[in-house]
From Swiss-Prot:
Bias type Polar residues, positions: 240-260, 730-742, 749-773, 789-800
Gene: Shab
Subunit structure: Heterotetramer of potassium channel proteins.
Biased composition (Gly residues): 1-10, 171-191, 898-908
GO function terms (MF aspect): delayed rectifier potassium channel activity; potassium channel regulator activity; voltage-gated potassium channel activity
UniProt-recorded name of the protein: Potassium voltage-gated channel protein Shab
InterPro entries (alphabetical): BTB/POZ_dom (IPR000210), Ion_trans_dom (IPR005821), K_chnl_volt-dep_Kv (IPR003968), K_chnl_volt-dep_Kv5/Kv9 (IPR003971), SKP1/BTB/POZ_sf (IPR011333), T1-type_BTB (IPR003131), VG_K_chnl (IPR028325), Volt_channel_dom_sf (IPR027359)
Glycosylation sites: 245, 429, 530, 749, 756, 885, 888, 914
């Protein structure tokens, strides 16, 4: 037993020793791996530093060495510096008055040559070329950089170099000598393939974007020796040049918005407007030139807003096409009214164009953003009167179309037949068959009227027992006509959509009166044929109905607009007709009495009484004058003359009103018929595919007005902290650049806006929007230069001289990006979950405080503060650093109690008020450059899906740039600012 125990103990000890040995070996392996990783990291850092130095030396050496060949005849002597897209001097194209010789003046520690305005590389460097970074350098590198003598030493040297380029386009080699201060010699080899982008004007607002090659440098660069102040020579290997087929930034200035050429960069647009004091406005092919400052007089108009646009997207929202090379903006509009509108910018006086339709002129005023209230007094009355008349005509036309559209026949096969029959009998213009039926109906009306007239001729009458009777043949013709009228009336009544409306219609009543006397007469004659005593009375009644047959001629009013207008005039001019009858009655009474007393004493006078004189007075006042009765005395003739003159005046007074009513109704009827014909023609053309309907004459403007997305304004006027509303301001860190403090608490306006919010206006009542972390419009145009060595070479632009933010109502606001509604919906769900988590955290905190003993208050308070900091960090990404600092402060606070560490803001924690203020903020999301295309696609899809045309009053486009905080791996580069399209509210 003892041996077994000893053996077991020995085995256990051996196993423990093996485990300890394995642990030691494992720890050694981990240490070795860590050392290897550190060595690799140091090696990478060293290689990166060496590569950066080589990049800098390589770029400057290439710039100086190929300056002579890069110069073009147009560049030499233009006395204008050239810049790359980062806002730095492009040393390859920096021409001066001295031409290419100016490059000779650039040396180590030397001054520029006397012949030109070349750029100084900087202070003296005792070891070689001054190290400068061009910010976009991405070419090859030199295996052995040139080395020079200390500055100030006098000597001479020679440089030679040779090498083969890694680029497929070619290689280069060269040698040269130079004399002067700081001459150097050296050799090296390596590949050089560098993208160069340049613009023909200074850059005040550098904007990084996706590179586009306009000129490639290939080949190797050998040793480089830099000449001194004598400007005689530059030695070194000169690389070969090859032009690329891709489009560069210089060519982009010639691009137009509708072409396939990439749009120009925002800084190009801004500098084009800064360089040119005039601008060409092309409206419908007619060019106008105007000063930019003239357009600034009306900043809220379309041309005034065009002056402030600095991005391609903002410009194409306002115009249809443009060319920076020609300094021309094109508007696809009618040019007739633009001269008057442009004169309004110049003189401040707006006049209408008489040759134009008033509605077309009004549409042009609305398009250019000019209010019609600016019209001069000489044109105000004429403009509004003409516009009111046109609107009244359009209203009546729309009313006619509305009445036509109100005819409802229901659904189903029977309704289709009913509608077809109604249009066939009631609307002759709808089809050829309807016109044929209308012609047949007119022929029957005329035939019936002729038969009625011929029946009165004695030669055609039939004598029965000494009593004249109707001709049997003409009676048969009349019977056929009455049968047609009866059938037509029954079919029209059965097909009408509204029976009661049809029955009380004026024309339908005439149709009924045209056929009813025939059947009444026929019925009376047949029923009283044997009653001899009553037959004579029946014949008198029949004669009355026979007289009513003449009303058949009024059936022509259904097919004649003039007859309908006459009936409308008589119906709507009853007041004027009554006034006319009153005037005539008074005149007849007065002049008949005077004529009676003047003529009663004459022998064989016809004025035997006043009623007998009414006839004479009536025909005299109406200027008819039959002559059957006339005065014979001198006084009677004077009375007759005065009666005639008064009759002319009395009759002429109400006649113009009656005539106007007739003309108005006739014009309305003709307009209604034309409107129906035009609408039917358009419907027929649409069915046949001859035309395509559209909603707005300017499709681009319609698309701009249909955009309804979300944008965010960060007002820099009020600097209030998100989590510390008491005034403890803390900035939010960002990747590679310093961001703004996000506003909250009282007065913050980090919320949805329509682009018209004024400064300090709170729009928190609307739905909050989403923005990317650090995605804002930063107008600090010297941000890149502060971290660049070239900052010492050129003067930096101040923030006051930079391009101002684009906002009409709030110029101090900085516009940031927008997101789609789907992102907002997801954020609302996330906010709801966060609020629930906050409530749970608060409940847990209360439970912990109740259960925790008094002695452990400090530790408990620190834990609660940590929880609260986590909640605050999940509520708003911009408050991450603040909440973390608060939690650290509460953890390190000695002797703090649980209540103080958990809820008191003095200890660095987050209180309930801060939480309630923080949870209303939106979630900040990070946007990477790879998501730009997807973001633009979502924005375009939402624009097409919304297609809102109801918000036409707001027409102010909102511009912004979204700065995506990424890195290119090169020093001095802090991301890309890519312009996106915003809503045109």
């Amino acid at each position: 037993m003892v041996g077994q125990l000893q053996g077991g103990q020995a085995a256990g000890q051996q196993q423990q020793q093996q485990q300890a040995t394995q642990q030691q070996q494992h720890s050694k392996q981990q240490q070795q791996q860590q050392q290897q990783q550190q060595q690799q990291l140091q090696l990478k850092q060293h290689q990166q530093q060496q590569q950066d130095i080589l990049y800098q030396q390589h770029n400057e050496a290439i710039a100086i060495a190929r300056g002579l060949q890069a110069a073009t005849p147009a560049d030499i002597g233009d006395n204008q510096p050239y810049y790359d897209t980062s806002g730095n001097v492009d040393w390859e194209r920096a021409m001066g008055a001295g031409g290419a010789g100016a490059y000779g003046g650039i040396g180590i520690g030397s001054l520029p040559a006397a012949g030109g305005a070349a750029y100084h590389l900087g202070p003296a460097n005792p070891a070689g070329l001054v190290s400068r970074h061009l910010d976009y350098g991405d070419g090859g590198h030199l295996a052995g950089p040139s080395a020079g003598l200390p500055a100030g030493a006098v000597g001479s040297g020679a440089g030679a170099g040779a090498g083969a380029g890694a680029s497929v386009t070619g290689s280069g080699s060269g040698a040269g000598t130079g004399t002067g201060t700081g001459a150097g010699s050296g050799s090296g080899s390596g590949a050089a393939g560098k993208e160069v982008r340049y613009a023909p004007f200074p850059v005040a607002s550098p904007t990084h974007s996706i590179p586009t090659t306009s000129q490639q440098i290939v080949g190797s660069v050998g040793g480089v020796g830099v000449g001194g102040a004598s400007s005689q020579s530059i030695s070194g290997g000169v690389p070969t040049h090859s032009q690329s087929n891709t489009t560069g930034a210089l060519q982009r200035t010639h691009s137009r918005s509708m072409s396939s050429i990439p749009p120009p960069e925002p800084f190009m647009i801004a500098q084009s407007k800064a360089v040119n004091s005039r601008v060409s406005i092309n409206v419908g092919g007619v060019r106008h030139e105007v000063l930019w400052r003239t357009l600034e007089r009306l900043p809220h108009t379309r041309l005034g807003r065009l002056r402030e646009c600095t991005t391609h997207e903002a410009i194409v929202e306002l115009c249809d096409d443009y060319s920076l090379a020609d300094n021309e903006y094109f508007f696809d509009r009618h040019p007739k009214s633009f001269s008057s509108i442009l004169n309004f910018y110049r003189t401040g006086k707006l006049h209408i164009v008489d040759e134009m339709c008033v509605l077309a002129f009004s549409d042009d005023l609305e398009y250019w953003g000019v209010d019609e209230l600016y019209l001069e007094s000489c044109c105000q009355h004429k403009y509004h009167q003409r516009k009111e008349n046109v609107h009244e005509e359009m209203r009546k036309e729309a009313e006619s179309l509305r009445q036509r559209d109100e005819e409802e026949f229901g659904e189903g096969k029977f309704s289709e037949y009913q509608k077809y029959l109604w249009e066939l009998l009631e609307k002759p213009n709808t089809s050829f068959a309807a016109r044929v039926i209308a012609v047949i109906s007119i022929l029957f009306i005329v035939l019936s009227t002729i038969a009625l007239t011929l029946n009165t001729l004695p030669q055609l009458q039939h004598i029965d027992n000494g009593t004249p009777q109707d001709n049997p043949q003409l009676a048969m013709v009349e019977a056929v006509c009455i049968t047609w009228f009866t059938l037509e009336y029954i079919l029209r009544f059965s097909a009408s959509p509204d029976k009661w409306k049809f029955f009380k219609g004026g024309l339908n009543i005439i149709d009924l009166l045209a056929i009813l006397p025939y059947f009444v007469s026929l019925f009376l004659l047949e029923t009283n044929k044997n009653a001899t005593d009553q037959f004579q009375d029946v014949r008198r009644v029949v004669q009355v109905f026979r007289i009513m047959r003449i009303l058949r001629v009024l059936k022509l009013a259904r097919h004649s607009t003039g007859l309908q207008s006459l009936g409308f005039t008589l119906r709507n001019s009853y007041k004027e007709l009554g006034l006319l009858m009153l005037f005539l009655a008074m005149g007849v009474l007065i002049f008949s009495s005077l004529a009676y007393f003047a003529e009663k004493d004459e022998k064989d006078t016809k004025f035997v009484s006043i009623p007998e004189a009414f006839w004479w007075a009536g025909i005299t006042m109406t200027t008819v004058g039959y002559g059957d009765i006339c005065p014979t005395t001198a006084l009677g003739k004077v009375i007759g003359t005065v009666c005639c003159i008064c009759g002319v005046l009395v009759v002429a007074l109400p006649i113009p009103i009656i005539v106007n009513n007739f003309a108005e109704f006739y014009k309305n009827q003709m307009r209604r018929e034309k409107a129906l014909k035009r609408r039917e023609a358009l419907d027929r053309a649409k069915r046949e595919g001859s035309i395509v309907s559209f909603h707005h004459i300017n499709l681009k403007d319609a698309f701009a007005k249909s955009m309804d997305l979300i944008d965010v304004i960060v007002d820099t006027g009020k600097q209030t902290n998100v989590v510390h509303p008491k005034g403890k301001r803390q900035s939010t860190p960002n990747i590679g650049r310093q961001t703004l403090d996000v506003q909250s608490a009282p007065g913050h306006n980090l919320s949805q806006t329509d682009g018209n919010s004024t400064e300090g206006e709170s729009t928190s009542g609307r739905n909050p929007a989403t923005t990317g972390t650090g995605c804002y419009k930063n107008y600090d145009h010297v941000a890149n230069l502060r971290n660049s060595n070239l900052h010492n070479r050129r003067g930096s632009s101040s923030e006051q001289d930079a391009v101002p933010p684009y906002s009409f109502d709030n110029p101090n606001a900085r516009q940031t990006s927008m997101m789609a509604m789907e992102s907002y919906r997801r954020e609302q769900q996330a906010l709801l979950q966060q609020q629930q988590q906050q409530q749970q955290q608060m409940l847990q905190m209360q439970q912990i405080q109740q259960k925790a003993p008094n002695g452990n208050g400090g530790a408990t308070g620190g834990g609660v503060a940590n929880n609260l900091a986590m909640v605050a960090a999940s509520s708003a990404a911009t408050a991450v650093a603040t909440a973390t600092n608060a939690s650290n402060a509460s953890n390190t606070a000695p002797g703090s109690e649980g209540a103080e560490g958990g809820g008191d803001g003095d200890g660095g924690g987050v209180d309930d008020d801060n939480l309630s203020q923080a949870k209303g903020l939106p979630i900040q999301m990070m946007i990477t450059p790879g998501e730009v295309a997807e973001l633009r696609r979502q924005v375009a899809l939402e624009n097409l899906q919304n297609q809102r045309m109801d918000n036409l009053e707001q027409d102010v486009p909102v511009e912004f740039e979204c700065c995506f905080c990424t890195t290119k791996g090169l020093p001095g580069c802090h991301g890309e600012c890519i312009p996106l399209r915003a809503n045109s509210v």
